């Protein structure tokens, strides 16, 4: 089952992956985080937020139970967002130059700003919306 899911997601990303780019302007926007609790470690350059977390950066919206963000020396963030049973992580972002969005849901989502890659782990769902209409979905 995992092999089949990996194959399906890989095929989908190969087919639609080349033109799927997030808004370039999002890279220069500040990240805003709301959560029940938040802790920042200035020495380690890590932020941990827990409890009804909502993070936004430009057109990026992410909702999770917990988020850990690590910042490298160039200021690029690596984010791990986790959900819980019945409450998966949700992510939505606009595609560059189009009236399209992609939405992702999974038990865990990892996002690397440096490579502009996201990784969906556990019960993953990926959707492409044109306007507000569902165009493609893979589970």
Residue ranges and their predicted role:
Residues 7-17:
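Bacterial N-terminal signal peptides
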């Amino acid at each position: 089952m995992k092999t089949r899911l990996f194959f399906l997601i890989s095929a989908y990303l190969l087919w639609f992956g080349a033109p799927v780019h997030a808004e370039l302007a999002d890279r220069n926007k500040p990240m805003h985080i709301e959560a029940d609790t938040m802790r920042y470690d200035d020495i380690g350059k890590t932020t941990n937020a827990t409890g009804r977390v909502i993070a936004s950066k430009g057109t990026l919206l992410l909702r999770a139970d917990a988020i850990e963000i690590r910042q490298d020396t160039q200021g690029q963030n690596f984010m791990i967002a986790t959900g819980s049973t019945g409450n998966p992580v949700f992510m939505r972002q606009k595609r560059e130059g189009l009236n399209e969005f992609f939405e992702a849901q999974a038990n865990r989502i990892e996002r690397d700003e440096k490579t502009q890659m996201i990784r969906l782990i556990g019960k993953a769902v990926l959707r492409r919306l044109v306007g507000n209409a569902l165009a493609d979905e893979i589970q």
